[in-house]
Amino acid sequence: MSRENNCTTADLAWGIPSITQAWGLWALFGVVTMLLLISLAALLSQWTRGRRRTQEEQGPPSGRSVEEVPLYGNLHYLQTGRLSEESRSEEQDPSSGGLARGAEEATCYTSLQLRPAQGRIPSSGTPIKYCEVVLDSEPKPQASGPEPELYASVCAQTRRARASFPDQAYANSQPAPS
């Protein structure tokens, strides 16, 4: 049997019948294609809506854009290269005390802790624990050289009974004059 005997001139290509010969097959193909496209459009719509909703819930703190939120604390405005819009307008009007307020806002502080989601009640966070300066009277055996005797101890619960320096402002400063 040769292939030419089975093939008619009404075929679009080998094995694909024309619309007049198999209109029901082409109609079914069209319906399935339309349902597939509608399903794809609905899926993309739900995906973008859900993504937009999660971005609104997890958005930047206090309504500011991500570029405005500093990553590290204690950045002076000369180091960052920009001022806030409020301090720029206040520096232009010195009669309202804008220069003093602009100088106060020159240093930025931020917390590197994650903020709670906007739907929850914010907690007070962990309280700040201050350092104590203590004198280490126990010598440590080390051959590399002498270590300094004064050091700052963070959360030094076990060393609190040792000597502290209440009359000095800082660990390495001179005693307060009497």
Swiss-Prot record:
Lymph node, spleen and thymus. It is found in: Cell membrane. Keywords: Adaptive immunity, Cell membrane, Disulfide bond, Glycoprotein, Immunity, Membrane, Phosphoprotein, Signal-anchor, Transmembrane, Transmembrane helix. The chain crosses the membrane at residues 24-44. Residues 72-75, 170-173 are annotated as: Interaction with GRB2. The keyword Protein biosynthesis does not apply. GO terms for biological process: adaptive immune response; regulation of T cell activation; signal transduction; T cell homeostasis. Glycans are attached at residue 6. One of its GO terms (molecular function) is kinase binding. Residues 151-154 are annotated as: Interaction with CSK. Residues 1-23 are extracellular. GO terms for cellular component: plasma membrane. Residues 81-102 are annotated as: Disordered. The modification Phosphoserine is found at residues 62, 65, 84, 87, 89, 164. Phosphorylated on tyrosines upon TCR activation; which promotes recruitment of PTPN11, GRB2 and CSK. It is a single-pass type III membrane protein. Residues 45-178 are cytoplasmic. The modification Phosphothreonine is found at residue 126. Its main location: membrane. Residues 128-133 are annotated as: Interaction with PTPN11. The modification Phosphotyrosine is found at residues 72, 109, 130, 151, 170. Negatively regulates T-cell antigen receptor (TCR)-mediated signaling. Involved in positive selection of T-cells. Homodimer; disulfide-linked. When phosphorylated, interacts with PTPN11/SHP2, GRB2 and CSK. This is Signaling threshold-regulating transmembrane adapter 1. The gene is Sit1.
